[in-house]
Amino acid sequence: MKIRFLAGLGLGLLFCFMGSVKAELLSVATAEVCAQQWASFVGQGQADELTKILDDSYQHTHGTGLVENRVEFLGALRSGMRKYEPIQLEEVKTRLFGECAVVTGKFALKVSIKGKMMEGVNRFSFVVVQTPQGPKIVSFQATAIKPAS
């Protein structure tokens, strides 16, 4: 009886341990969900939701070359200085490197900057890392694709 109890307890602890280890591993699906959430939150101007998935060290490089940190990027969204139309990520590809993922693809951009509309197609890359607080985006970079002449 004791052996069955101890065996059951041991298996239970093993499954609990394995479950907690799995929860901490970054997957392609988790990284892509993070990128899709970013697109949704930015496109809807939801800066408060965006703060939950951006790492404190977040760096945002715009297609224009402008580089902003987390505070600057969120501040422009909150103030209304920058308003994005809904963003749909396309051609999404993800590569895993341990607890880090690089998510790439393209999107059509429509944004109002201080009331002036700007639009175009961009390639993007996100760097997503697994942290003790869950997956976080540490970097975003857009590269404008010039229209064919």
Describe the role of every protein-language-model region.
Residues 12, 18-56, 149:
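Short, low-complexity N-terminal intrinsically disordered segments enriched in polar/charged residues
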Residues 26-29, 46-97:
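A solvent-exposed, acidic/Ser-Thr-rich amphipathic alpha-helical stretch
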Residues 82-83, 110-119:
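Short, cysteine-centered beta-strand-loop-beta hairpins and adjacent loop/turn segments enriched
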Residues 38, 49-50, 58, 73, ...:
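Hydrophobic pocket/interface hotspot
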